[in-house]
A protein has these predicted regions:
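Residues forming the flavin
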Residues: 1-319
Length: 319
């Protein structure tokens, strides 16, 4: 079993920033484990700008930012891809399933930079069948930007956060008609500047105080039921209407990936800015700790976690 001083789970912006920072502080025997085929995280599927302003002094496309950040990773840092961490034990043993099978390695300290996952439509009170044509915003980004697929023709987007607006732009650029962006709240979920940048050029309307309550269709989505909501956020069925579409894209929130920490019985520290957990050798950063709006703060979180981990390791190693 290979032994490491520091194992970082996740090679997105937080994990890579943590690895770079730890190495710059003299830490050796660092392993970064990434479940995807390539390191870089979500920015790899983002062709829009807005990444790296704090680190590089200029706003970059997500793909360019990911390449630059990866270029800072020392060759002395071990990086595994296509490797899924199944478990972390209380003795620091990390169980990994990869292309070569299953293996175990040990760490004196572990940083979880596992990111977050999208909330699926199954978590929403939406009735009806589950035909094809229903996607999360992140999956649409991957299909359009990485695979070059055309996702749909007549699209409804549920959720007016920044990701929902950016995906609406990508869909329009690739020939789809985005009929509307629906928002359950009475105000825009994302930045107003992103509405001007991504929605207004395509004349995409935002319908506030409305949600989807039902989907229609057998093999392919045919329509959605749009309902306004009352002051408590409950749909008003009598005021609803059916909107014909072949695609529904949901952008309704993100859930931090904390299962590895929870399986250990560990907890996050109560202070919102603290990357430590109830286990002294375990740290959590980036979107796994809390969902961030900017990659700059995700990076900062990774650096903070590396500092905390190095301080802990200096105490037990005597460095």
């Amino acid at each position: 079993m290979e032994n490491y001083n520091l194992i970082i789970v996740g090679a997105g912006p937080a994990g890579l920033a943590a690895a770079i920072s730890a190495k710059s502080r003299g830490m050796d025997r660092i392993l970064v484990i990434e479940r995807m085929e390539a390191p870089g995280g979500i920015p790899l599927q983002c062709l829009h700008t807005g990444f790296g302003k704090r680190r590089y002094g200029v706003e970059l496309k997500g793909t360019v930012y990911a390449d630059r950040l990866l270029g800072e990773v020392s060759k002395e840092i071990e990086l595994w891809t296509n490797a899924f961490v199944l478990a972390v034990s209380r003795d620091g043993t990390v169980t990994v399933s990869g292309t070569g099978g299953m293996c175990k390695c040990s760490a004196r300290a572990v940083i979880l930079a596992t990111g977050c996952r999208e909330r699926p439509i199954g978590s929403l009170p939406v009735y009806g069948t589950r035909p094809s044509g229903i996607f999360t915003a992140g999956s649409v980004q991957r299909m359009i930007n990485l695979n070059g697929y055309r996702v749909g023709s007549r699209v409804v987007v549920l959720g007016s956060g920044d990701v929902g607006m950016i995906v609406s732009h990508h869909l329009s650029e690739h020939g789809a008609q985005v009929l509307a962006v629906l928002e359950k709240e009475q105000k825009l979920g994302g930045l107003v500047r992103n509405r001007h940048r991504y929605l207004d050029p395509h004349a995409i309307p935002v319908i506030l105080g409305s949600t989807v309550t039902q989907v229609y269709g057998e093999r392919r989505l045919e329509a959605v039921q749009v309902c306004p909501v009352d002051k408590k956020g409950k749909p008003i069925p009598a005021s609803g209407y059916r909107l014909a579409c072949d695609t529904l894209v949901t952008s309704v929130g993100l859930i931090p990936e904390l299962e590895l920490m929870e399986d250990l019985g560990a907890e996050l520290c109560r202070q919102n800015t603290d990357v430590r957990t109830s286990l002294p050798w375990l740290f959590v950063c980036g979107n796994a700790r809390r969902v961030h709006s900017l990659v700059d703060t995700v990076e900062q979180d990774g650096v903070q976690a590396s500092i905390a981990a190095c301080e802990y390791l200096s105490g037990i190693i005597g460095g």
